[in-house]
Amino acid sequence: MDSNPGADQAVAPIVEQALRTAMSAGWEVRGTTSPNPPVGAVIISTSGEIVGTGATQPVGGVHAEVQALADAAGKTEGATAVVTLEPCRHTGRTGPCTQALIEAGIKDVLFLHSDPNPSAGGGEQVLVDAGINVVQLPSPEGVPDALIPWLKSVQLRRPHVTLKFAQTIDGFTAAADGTSQWITGEMARDYVHADREHRDAIIIGTGTALIDNPSLTARYPDGTQREHQPRRVVIGRRNIADAGDAASNLNRLGFEQYATIDEALAELYATGARDVLVEGGAGLASGFANQGLVDWLQVYQAPLLLGEGISVLAHPLTNTLKGASALCPRAASGAGR
């Protein structure tokens, strides 16, 4: 076993290409695999060619390694498997991926992340005991990693939370009269819908539900619905089911309501959600932030000035600069206005 991320095999061009391909495959299935992780896998033949690619299928379907092995049928003996997550060793709805790799005659297994799940982890040692060379790879630069939210969720025993909001350049999410449509442009809104498709749930507060009457669906620019739809979740004590026309879209499409943030996150995690998007409003955003429950921020900033208006957070987090929450920027890009 060689768990040194700097091993020569880890930096071979074909291995880096295979890892990037595997990460891309995992990225594409985000939102469709929970509670299982969105894993990608690639098979490299003995001649050094990529001959199989796979990704985790929805619950009950095959795991990434099994799909990649099937894609590489007849070319797996002595081959190398490159996987974004340590292969599982447990039997659930499907058999252990370690056994599938062993039976396929795989010689080397290169993986990116260790599996923190006690029931599934430990696959590395199973493979080593079977005589397979195992190497843990370093993360390549500039490649989105679909597993980060899932890994964080397993660690925290709650869904990974991204707080999303749009704001003017002076920090307001709506004007003083309450108008907010639209701070951002069409390109940004299209991106939001594409992102929603890859989330397990979209969360809003009762105020947003009653004021905006949102659908919380993932749609294409022409208005048609995308293939995967996240769960629609409302947090708060006002009864949305009895709100009539004020919340007609949610009542037509169906939604879940929980009284508190803690109750919502506990039930969402228990029922398989691992990656959720909080879309507002200011009171709910404050609640998540004050409880230290925001893992990522997704901010759309428009080149607009208001001077006054409704802030992102309804309640302060601190009254001193020393108490401010320090953030670590991950990426920035343009998305129109």
Swiss-Prot record:
Cofactor(s) the protein requires to work: Zn(2+)
Superkingdom to which the source organism belongs: Bacteria
Pathway: Cofactor biosynthesis; riboflavin biosynthesis; 5-amino-6-(D-ribitylamino)uracil from GTP: step 2/4; Cofactor biosynthesis; riboflavin biosynthesis; 5-amino-6-(D-ribitylamino)uracil from GTP: step 3/4
Binding site for substrate: 180, 196, 216, 219, 279
Catalytic activity from the UniProt record: 2,5-diamino-6-hydroxy-4-(5-phosphoribosylamino)-pyrimidine + H2O + H(+) = 5-amino-6-(5-phospho-D-ribosylamino)uracil + NH4(+); 5-amino-6-(5-phospho-D-ribitylamino)uracil + NADP(+) = 5-amino-6-(5-phospho-D-ribosylamino)uracil + NADPH + H(+)
PANTHER family hit by this protein: 2,5-DIAMINO-6-RIBOSYLAMINO-4(3H)-PYRIMIDINONE 5'-PHOSPHATE REDUCTASE, DIHYDROFOLATE REDUCTASE FAMILY PROTEIN (AFU_ORTHOLOGUE AFUA_8G06820)
Protein name as it appears in the record: Riboflavin biosynthesis protein RibD
Taxonomic source organism: Corynebacterium ammoniagenes
